[in-house]
Design a protein with these regions (language model features):
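Non-heme Fe(II)/2-oxoglutarate
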Residues: 1-25
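Alpha-helix initiation and capping sites
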Residues: 11-15, 31, 50-54
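A structural signal for well-ordered alpha-helical scaffolds and beta->alpha junctions
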Residues: 14-18, 57, 113
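A short coil-to-beta-strand element that immediately follows conserved catalytic motifs
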Residues: 26-36
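Acidic/histidine-enriched, glycine/proline-rich intrinsically disordered or flexible terminal extensions
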Residues: 134-156
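Short proline/glycine-enriched turn/loop segments at secondary-structure junctions
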Residues: 106-112
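Short secondary-structure junction/hinge motifs that connect adjacent elements
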Residues: 1-3, 34-37
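Catalytic core of non-heme Fe(II) oxygenases with the double-stranded beta-helix
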Residues: 40-102, 114-117, 123-138
């Protein structure tokens, strides 16, 4: 279930999280995008995926609701070497990660209660025109640019 994020919360989160994510990645970030509140119900799983590379390069998942008396719902990151690392992600914590580069998931079904999270993503300043941006990122960015041009010209 997706719920709208109250504007006052959105206005607080960007300036609060951006410096923390700047420090995490060791770079200056831009274009913060917020998504939330996403509510997961018992039995939910999050399949392994990477986020869109044009917007979610450096991200944080903020756990805003999970009863601490219930079992953890592990968050799994899979490194480039294929090895998985699991994290307990407790209420009130922000989990920072490279969302467009690392596969991430919640492979076990959610047991008991609900889990609610807000997600925020940023791109490095100058991205995707920096050496670390891969071909997939440049391709997606190019396609999106063409779509925007088509919309402005009334072709789409």
């Amino acid at each position: 279930t997706a719920l709208p994020l109250p504007r006052n919360l959105a206005a607080l989160l960007r300036p609060l999280m951006q410096p923390k994510l700047d420090e995490f990645c060791g770079c200056a970030l831009q274009n913060g995008i917020l998504h939330g509140i996403r509510v997961y119900h018992p039995g939910a799983q999050l399949l392994p995926h990477a986020d869109w590379p044009h917007a979610w390069v450096v991200s944080a998942a903020l756990n805003v609701r999970r009863n601490v008396t219930l079992p953890d719902w592990p968050f799994e990151l899979r490194g480039r070497d294929g090895r998985a690392t699991r994290f307990a992600h407790r209420e009130g914590q922000a989990l920072m990660y490279e969302a467009s580069r690392l596969l991430h998931s919640r492979p076990e079904p959610l047991r008991g209660g609900v889990y609610a999270a807000v997600f925020i993503g940023f791109t490095p300043v100058g991205y995707p025109n920096i050496p670390s941006a891969g071909i997939a990122t440049r391709a997606i960015t190019s396609v999106m640019g063409m779509q925007q041009l088509g919309l402005r010209l009334g072709l789409l």
